[in-house]
Amino acid sequence: MSWQTYVDTNLVGTGAVTQAAIIGHDGNTWATSAGFAVSPANGAALANAFKDATAIRSNGFELAGTRYVTIRADDRSVYGKKGSAGVITVKTSKAILIGVYNEKIQPGTAANVVEKLADYLIGQGF
């Protein structure tokens, strides 16, 4: 399965996230939903946050032109909020999954979808 298929089917296609991307640990985009562009600089900053979350805990982070307040940050997951919308990011051994949800979607529903896909990819060696 291609990275784009994971974005289109396993993330956005579930209805639990409205936009999604899969990026490498270097911040470069592997696949993305239409209209959602993560800059290499934002991607690299996010990747670094999994190693040291100090900066994003106090300053938040930006993805695709939206600034988020950090509500969770550890070596596996970084969650952000903007109003009642937010973003779930999960690191696997080779990639970072990003799922954005809007105010109509429950944060737990979005987190469940992104975290489960991450678990699957980790199980496949990714």
UniProtKB/Swiss-Prot annotation:
Gene Ontology CC, one term: cytoskeleton
Domain of life: Eukaryota
Residue numbers carrying N6,N6,N6-trimethyllysine: K104
Keywords: Actin-binding, Cytoplasm, Cytoskeleton, Methylation
Signal peptide limits: none
Database matches in InterPro entries: PFN (IPR048278), PFN_euk (IPR005455), PFN_sf (IPR036140), Profilin_CS (IPR027310)
Cell compartment(s), UniProt: Cytoplasm, Cytoskeleton
Residues found modified as Blocked amino end (Ser): S2
PROSITE patterns reported in the protein's UniProt record: PROFILIN
Pfam families in the record: Profilin (PF00235)
Major place of residence: cytoplasm
Family assignment from sequence similarity: Belongs to the profilin family.
Protein name stated in the entry: Profilin-2
Lineage: Eukaryota, Amoebozoa, Discosea, Longamoebia, Centramoebida
